[in-house]
Amino acid sequence: KKISNHITKKVADRLEEIFKNDRPQFEEKWDSLKLFIQYGMLTDEKFYDRAVKFALFKDVEGKYFTFEEYKNLIKDNQTDKEGNLIYLYTTNKDEQYSYIQAAKDKGYSVLEMDGQLDVHLIGQLEQKFEKSRFVRVDSDTIDNLIRKEDSNKVTLSEEQKMAMQEVFKSQMPKLNKTEFYVTFEALGENANPVMLTQSEYMRRMREMSAMQPGMSFYGEMPDSFNFVLNTDHPLIKKVLTEEEQACDEKLKPILSDIKGWEARQADLREAQSKKKEDEITAQEKEDMT
């Protein structure tokens, strides 16, 4: 064990030396070194303690930061109303482009974390960093990822929500072991009309289960996605209006029949109220049912 500790110290000292003496070269080689350094941080507590001085984050712009540098960069703008520092990250810049842009539009920074051990490192850093959370940019709407204030209220009635859920669910693909849930957010008329998000917790558990046999339970669970409708957007409002108009057209003859039936019932009740019980015929009683 002493030999192992000595080797760990020598390796960490050498990496720190390179970082201090030639940081540009260290950054240039970081993508090649990252897997080795992250593995050491995850498996050796002493190596972690040394590595936090030179381990790097890389953002989507290709800039590198130490953990402390990045914390200082984002702390003023990416702290939520509960005092939690929120680290936004992406695992695929191309697939998650629109979500990254939504974060940038808010002035937020996004980390690129697409490595083999990044999901495990994230779990470790959340335990090490005080009042901090890592969330992927597509795991919720940007206002919910870093909640600065109470969300704008959705003004749809429960009946309108149910109708819109049916409209959109009817157009969704039927995929094996995949579930879609239609949800509603008031995101502003300039935000996207729809967004597809996936729970950070469940997605992370599924990713970790692929590498840890003991977590296979999560791997067997169906993928779950939220199809978020922005109720402030003109397109969503248009869909709602058209749905209500189409529904009204189909309901008109039914409502007319109901009103006619109610009028006949009222006339029968009035007529029967003037008769004694034994004067009401069997047919009249049947007409009231």
What do the predicted segments below correspond to?
Residues K1-T289:
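Conserved GHKL (Bergerat-fold) ATPase module
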